[in-house]
Amino acid sequence: WITMTDLMTGLVLVFVVMFLYSFLQNNVEKFQDDLAKENSSKALQETLKERNVEAIIDSATGIVKISDLELFEINKSDLSPKGKEYLDKFIPAYIDSLFENDYLKGRIDKILIQGHTDSQNFAGQFTEDEQYMKNMELSLNRAYSVANYMIKTPYNKNYGKKLRETVIVEGASSSTPVLVNGKEDFAKSRRVELKLIMKKNVK
């Protein structure tokens, strides 16, 4: 006969095994995700250096940060001539570093283009909620402008389908400011970020 003690011991062992499996699986996925992002960062840094293009890249996450002044006029969401000139150099380097990399190209699920603003108020009588939503609109429209330029410009025709499947946009308003010594750095907070979202369980 199986005693109640034996039954409970067996159940505990089953739960322990399930917990360990889940824990290890999550850690493997995180390791793969971190490795892919580190790989993308290294590949992009090398490509940008070769092509003499400047960008701020987080070596651990692969996130690219582009200052608003590189792309837009103040409080505008249409790309400036300077912005188009910059993207004409940056985007081919960015795309090539991702889609010509054998390790990365099958692991990328989405490319998130995310707009950010600072928390300074627009001129006029607006409530805090209205100010936040105006910044939301500006940040979203700026992300859209970059994505639109990335997809529509001629040099990406070889990757057109891939970009349409992966590029998504998001407006973060002033929700994630860049802090320096505990205070918001307005200039650094106004930016467009490009982030990679990796597929899960890719061998």
Where are the regions that the model predicts?
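Periplasmic OmpA-like peptidoglycan-binding domain that tethers envelope proteins to the cell wall
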Residues: 81, 114-201
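Extracytoplasmic
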Residues: 50-52, 59-61, 67, 74, ...
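Short amphipathic alpha-helical segments
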Residues: 36, 40, 82-86, 138, ...
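Short terminal targeting/anchoring segments
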Residues: 1-54, 59
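Short beta-strand/turn micro-motifs at beta-sheet edges
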Residues: 54, 100-102, 181-183
